[in-house]
Amino acid sequence: LEEYIYLGAHQGKVYKYLLTGELSIHTQLPTSASVISILPSVAGLIYVTDSDGFFIRDSLGEIRHVMLDSLSLLKDKNIESAKITCGDLLWLVHPVPGVTLFDLKTQRLSFIEGKDEQGRPLNTESDFCF
């Protein structure tokens, strides 16, 4: 059984670190952005970048780029963190209030802009339950 973890890096590099101590390049994504999160999903591996959207690697190894700056609903293309819930909903946390949701099954985007009891905007991971 081969045990490993994936590590994101600058300029679209993703490394595979074997627990035996071996480090190798796993993927070179076509971006100059940093890979901040690597998440398994029903669609395949999701590589989330800090400023260039995210990439989906399917089971055949094909990589598709979802560029957030081309989506008019998006409030901010910069991403601070990402989570996947129920295997098919990608939550993207931005520096601005609210979170962007991307449904991996339907490929639809939505935005939630919530407020707490005092009317303050919610925009951190801890503000939303995953």
Residues covered by each model-derived region:
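Carboxylate-rich, polar loop motifs that coordinate divalent cations or form catalytic acidic clusters
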Residues: L1-F130
